[in-house]
Amino acid sequence: MPSLNEIRSTFLNFFGGHGHEIVDSSPLVPRNDPTLMFTNAGMVQFKNVFTGLEHRDYNRATTSQKCVRAGGKHNDLDNVGYTARHHTFFEMLGNFSFGDYFKEDAIPFAWDLITKEFGIDKSRLLVTVYHTDDEAAEIWKKHAGLSDDRIIRIPTNDNFWMMGPTGPCGPCTEIFYDHGDHIWGGPPGSPEEDGDRFIEIWNLVFMQFEQFEDGTREPLPKPSIDTGMGLERIGALLQGSHDNYDTDLFKTLIEASAHATSVDPYGDKNVHHRVIADHLRSTSFLIADGVMPSNEGRGYVLRRIMRRAMRHAHLLGAQDPVMYRLVPALVGQMGQAFPELGRAQALIEETLMLEETRFRQTLDRGLKLLDEAVADVPEGGALPGETAFKLYDTYGFPLDLTQDALREKGRAVETEGFDAAMADQKAKARAAWAGSGETADESIWFDLAETHGATEFLGYDTEVAEGQVLALVKDGAQVAQLAEGETGWMVLNQTPFYAESGGQVGDSGGYLKSNGSGAIHDTQKRNGLFAHKVTPKAQPLKAGDVLEMRVDPARRTAIRANHSATHLLHEALRQALGAHVAQRGSLNAADRLRFDFSHSKALTLEELQKVEAEVNAYIRQNSPVETRIMTPDAARDLGAQALFGEKYGDEVRVVSMGRQSGSGKGVSGETYSLELCGGTHVKQTGDIGVFVTVGETASSSGVRRIEALTGEDAFAYLSAQDYRLAEVAASLKAQAADVPERVRSLLDERKALQNEVAQLRRELAMAGGGQGTAAPEAEAVAGVPFLAQSLSGVSGRDLPSLIDEHKARLGSGAILLIADTGGKAAVAAGVTADLTDRLSAVDLVKAAVAELGGKGGGGRPDMAQGGGKDASKADAAIAAAKAVIGG
């Protein structure tokens, strides 16, 4: 009996032996189809190949595609665990032809594989065809030898596939297996077709037409093939069961769940183990493909799946987290076929444990409330919607989890009341928004967020991705289109463009579409939406357009380097200055970075050099930059740095870089820098290139600011500095290495000359030389010796020392000196100690300054200084001082 792994290999090798390229599964988050929440079919990754928008090096392919159906119209969540074939995660085996072969080869390929390679009894097989597809029916007769009664013609769209209202389409043929009359059910097309006797195992789609808007169809020049066969279904059949949960893979997971909970795997609690086994697969693969639990979008679907599994673990009596303990069993079963599962194992386990721990804190209280409420609801009745909403709003119970719990009790949920309570909450939120002071222009973003939900950000993994235009905004109002050359704002369902936040500027770039293009100037965050400032260049831009979004790669690279450098800078400052250093703000632009941090004084040159050297040391280390998702508390317990004043949600992204011995902080190893951050970063620290500080200043009280450059900008700055140094060296007629000593020597020489000049000025002033108009000898004013001089060629700094020299010469008296400093006046007055009890130098200065066009003046009774605007009024100033003495 072949295992599922062997069946997968047989399928892929069969088609590989028939010239098909064996292509790896694409991620569960589709990159080329923004209309899909998750990849749900094998053809998703080939959509653009089928439509001619993409060319590959092969024209036939085969895959085993990871698929999830748990959101949107493809939502199997409620049935999972209770039926034989519903899953949230499954593998779709498929073979594809892109204009190479068609029906005459596709049907024989399928028949030969299932009857010869898999050895399925031909007598158990029957097929359906579209009622007008005589060609397919004839091939089945000719190659498989099927009689007319085993070729069922279906007139409905069940056997006609369409990619959309327009575009490629064509008939299908499906292969069914008859499990026998001991199982209830009828053949396809019969009233009993929903039974389990006849099970579809393979669907072959013949893309042979193109449908136009008027409903007409024309043959495609190169018809193509798209087939899909569920691995779990064919596996159950080949292992002798009609229940997918009886296959070897699910048995392993169910038994692991039973071991972890100490509950019989196949007793009356079996359904709980089945739910856990299925949900373990979908949650693990979603996390491995980059989806993290959240309250919106794909993350919310993941959280719903996780919490549903966790409730079933609770029903098995589990008191501690269970699901993370089952991951090794899953990796053992599927890790070889999907290596990404093993690579992400630690992240999967940690995410599951954190989510289950957090949810368990509210699960008991929520279930108690539910039990109390159900006591008042008769069997077959419905729980009031308001109660279900309280469970959702207060305890984080998704509606489908409550419905799932009630189904086991024979009750339902009154969904109209739930919807009404949800609408009421939104109305209150809208009223709060309206009263918050936001402008009418800004309130449009609340409406759009309520309608469309948060934008899915893809930019951690790619700089190019498709997105569908959900809304266009111009002058604060929603518009249907933006004309060529008109600038407005654009919202998409998903985008690779980073919206400005956390100090990192928004991305810019452009977009392409089938018949046009445009420029994206900036990206801003508006109430959870990513708003792109856009100008169409060729053709108008319309709501509903599907765009290929392209981030400016050079600009993004520079921004990433600067952002990662701020993380290294933050830790280097903490190492150099102390643990008190904390981020107070930052700017991570393409051409520079700015980092504000708590510190009370300017950094010394030695401190700056130490910080710069340490940052560059970790750049040269070229260590990987890693990201993890965890709770804020868990991140802080690890020592992660958080932005001052920032509010964080239930999960945070933790960025780590650099390795050092003995730090003990690392998520994996001894991490140098560990920060909560939602921005984009380099993959290796070496990608930063080089780091150089260009300024250190005060930002505000107790906050310093460092400005710096990285990468090409840093190299350009260093090159310019080197050129300037060479110019200085040439001017000094010295080698570059000797410039500092040569400059110090010149400065010492200059200082000596300045001192000599100052001394000569003082001597000249004391001698009454120069252009002084007052006599150097004192005159008696009201019995007080008073010496006054108006001087030129003397600076204000020289006046106090001249005052002291005059005091020493006079012995007793008052002095007033006025220096002409380019038309303005510097004033100083002095009074000897024996006279300060009756005369103050401050009063003399104030009187003089008033005449010179100045204000104030101050100092001590024995020495005061001031200044005025007009030195030509020196005589009047001296007279005013005399009046003070004589007064």
Swiss-Prot record:
The gene is alaS. Zn(2+) binds at H563, H567, C677, H681. Keywords: Aminoacyl-tRNA synthetase, ATP-binding, Cytoplasm, Ligase, Metal-binding, Nucleotide-binding, Protein biosynthesis, RNA-binding, tRNA-binding, Zinc. Transmembrane segments: none annotated. One of its GO terms (biological process) is alanyl-tRNA aminoacylation. Signal peptide: none annotated. Catalyzes the attachment of alanine to tRNA(Ala) in a two-step reaction: alanine is first activated by ATP to form Ala-AMP and then transferred to the acceptor end of tRNA(Ala). Also edits incorrectly charged Ser-tRNA(Ala) and Gly-tRNA(Ala) via its editing domain. It holds the Pfam family DHHA1. Its main location: cytoplasm. PROSITE patterns: AA_TRNA_LIGASE_II_ALA (PS50860). Its cofactor is Zn(2+). CDD domains: AlaRS_core. GO terms for cellular component: cytosol. The lineage of its organism: Bacteria, Pseudomonadati, Pseudomonadota, Alphaproteobacteria, Rhodobacterales. GO terms for molecular function: alanine-tRNA ligase activity; aminoacyl-tRNA deacylase activity; ATP binding; tRNA binding; zinc ion binding. It is found in: Cytoplasm. Belongs to the class-II aminoacyl-tRNA synthetase family. It is an enzyme of class 6 (ligase). Consists of three domains; the N-terminal catalytic domain, the editing domain and the C-terminal C-Ala domain. The editing domain removes incorrectly charged amino acids, while the C-Ala domain, along with tRNA(Ala), serves as a bridge to cooperatively bring together the editing and aminoacylation centers thus stimulating deacylation of misacylated tRNAs. Its EC number is 6.1.1.7. It catalyses: tRNA(Ala) + L-alanine + ATP = L-alanyl-tRNA(Ala) + AMP + diphosphate. InterPro entries: aa-tRNA-synth_II/BPL/LPL (IPR045864), Ala-tRNA-lgiase_IIc (IPR002318), Ala-tRNA-ligase_IIc_anticod-bd (IPR018162), Ala-tRNA-synth_IIc_core (IPR018165), Ala-tRNA-synth_IIc_N (IPR018164), Ala-tRNA_ligase (IPR050058), Ala_tRNA_ligase_euk/bac (IPR023033), DHHA1_dom (IPR003156). Binds 1 zinc ion per subunit. This is Alanine--tRNA ligase. It comes from the Bacteria.
